[in-house]
Amino acid sequence: MIRKVVKILWIFIALISLVCVFIFFSIAKGWIGYMPPVEDLENPNYKFATEVFSEDGKVLGTYSYSKENRVFVGYNDLSPNIINALIATEDVRFAEHSGIDAYALTRAVVKRGILMQKNAGGGSTITQQLSKQLYSPSADNVMERLFQKPIEWVIAVKLERYYTKEEILTMYLNKFDFLNNAVGIKTAAFTYFGCEPKDLKIEEAATLVGMCKNPSLYNPVRYNERSRGRRNVVLDQMRKAGYITEAERDSLQALPLKLKYNRVDHKEGLATYFREYLRGVLTAKKPDKANYRGWQMQKYYEDSLDWENNPLFGWCEKNTKKDGTKYNLYTDGLKIYTTLDSRMQQYAEDAVTEHLKELQGYFFKEKKGAKKAPYTFRLTQEQVDEILGRAMRLSDRYRIMKKAGATEAEIKKAFDTPEEMSVFSWEGEKDTIMTPMDSIRYYKFFLRAGFMSMDPRSGHVKAYVGGPNYHYFQYDMAMVGRRQVGSTIKPFLYTLAMENGFSPCDEVRHVEYTLIDENGKPWTPRNANKKLIGDMVTVKWGLANSDNWITAYLMSKLNPYNLKRLIHTFGVRNRDIVPSVSLCLGPFEISVGEMVSAYTAFPNKGIRVAPLFVTRIEDNDGNVLATFAPEMQEVISVSSAYKMLVMLRAVVNEGTGGRVRRLGVKADMGGKTGTTNYNADGWFMGFTPSLVSGCWVGGEDRDIHFDTMLHGQGASMALPIWTKYMVKVLGDKSLGYDENETFQLPEGYDPCKDDVNLEGDTHIEEPIEGLDELFN
């Protein structure tokens, strides 16, 4: 009887073994469940975020899909602490097994499955966990759950066959989702502790490894004490495995859990406007006129130029990988090396924030109690209502409700119904109750700004600020938005005069001048300068004091068409510039970036340099895919450049830019202020021998502005931002900018004499053939 029972038992065991062998064989062949092909096992389909680096080696941000913000890090760049913590906690016999730890598996089956001990530990190895992360989909039914573990075991064994232990550890840490948009160990190290993986301390590594058991349960941001308790468990495991001593464990367990939390978000961090601008440039499609509306023809024109002439524009569309597919900015793990300096970028953002916060107080005070605020009193109430109504119709809320079939009356009612919301303020985000319509008006109150700084020799853009806060004000006023430039355009008229034989020392009578415009009507510019009326003054004095009468006199001696042509030669691409006599006062719109690039010609001996944003692009393995060089063009003669340099220095030392000196900038520099009608726009352009920077400040709409010159002129609105920035840049010796650096003029140079040895041919390019046909 006993023999019969034993025989039956052995037959049963044999059958079970055969069934198990058949099941595992079927899984390996892919007959049961999902088994990835060999190619996928050898080359897992990772989605790595693209990293954006500053010139000084800092990570400015990443481009990724929302849940795949993973940045690759190699084994040699991992701290031993993270490796030791992971092995000690998740798989202490990791170096000994081939994917499945039989001892741990048996222990888990007996203690957890039979004895029902909850704290008996798991049986999964690191390799099994990796196989689950890589290839195991979620089980939707009992049958799928039944085969899920055997499938993971088979994949784990195959992974051990194709990869070294170091590679498996690296893959695991790169793959794991640590929550809070921190996918992979590199992003997690920065998100929670503000450091690189190689710099993780023991207790920090233990915290992150502790999350591997259940990231939601042990989220250190939400559950600090619970996460600390789990960290201490990991530290104890490290002590048991011999990675740390008992004394080290005790001292580390006593530490509080301190985070340096930095949530990775494209709307947060440094250079947000720049990163968004760069993203648009890199992923741009080939322009198709059919995709542009009538009011977008200027953009179509610029995109067409950039597609043909700018290798960075549409780079992901123009270039392909080895397999013939186009590069994906969000999943291919590219490394974009930009020209921005993180320190200078921080100084620029701080300068914008500090000044706008102060200026906003004056603006609120001026508009307090005004019924039409933030708009000027010159508008009628009907005009204000129409502007706000147009803003409502452009809002996301309006479009969503309209798409859902809501009537105009229903939409209007929703916009006039108070609700709880969080709004921006310079003191921090505020919770309040207001109607959506009131929120539109509220945000209109805030002044906007655009700032850019670049090296006039290399074209490297060092700082880029498109507005006060990207999270709330996403329209970029550095390179995308354009505003009227006012008097900052005058240097181009004076340049044209120098090219046509004028000298800074030529004298002109300071009286009102009347010109005949293109329609045959008289045009007499107003003039705020009441000094030396009727006296003879120099051309240099006219520019230094931004005098409209002297400007009008020069315009009377020159051709508006030639001025328009020269402006385009300086890199301004606005096709709507009208060649009228009033062109000399800057009634047309230019971006801050275009203006900064144009001004590089003055300290650079007549050579204009286009902005350079990226120096090279590498793939995930560090192979260089593309390099980029600055675009340079001689736009005026050396002689004219020297003369303009002399006059623009006088603007700062003797004229309207004198506030720069009072605010603490002592460097040799030139510059120009600019203010448009009714103080709608305030500008300041300034340059030293090694840095050209420009700033614009104004309201979202042109009818939002100061009503007085005290705070509304360019010297009050924009100049202080430039000054705050330069004081910090020149004060930071690590940047290498010397406050004592001077412009290199020829020895004994006299701008009143024309030195033929300095003369160069004025080179104004003809329009590029064929571009005009794009708009026919």
Identify the meaning behind each predicted range:
Residues 85-87, 238, 348, 458-459, ...:
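Active-site SXXK
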Residues 1-53, 113, 359:
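N-terminal type II signal-anchor transmembrane helix
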Residues 95-105, 183-186, 245-250, 498-519, ...:
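Short, well-structured active-site flanking segments
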Residues 2, 46-49, 53-304, 313-316, ...:
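Peptidoglycan glycan-strand catalytic modules in the bacterial/periplasmic cell-wall system
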Residues 256, 480-536, 610-625:
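Short, glycine/proline-biased beta-turn/loop segments that scaffold the active-site neighborhood
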Residues 125, 134-136, 141, 145, ...:
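Active-site-adjacent helix/loop patches that line small-molecule binding or acyl-intermediate pockets
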Residues 338, 342-358, 389-455, 460, ...:
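A penicillin-recognizing enzyme superfamily signal
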Residues 118, 245-405:
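Non-catalytic structural connector segments
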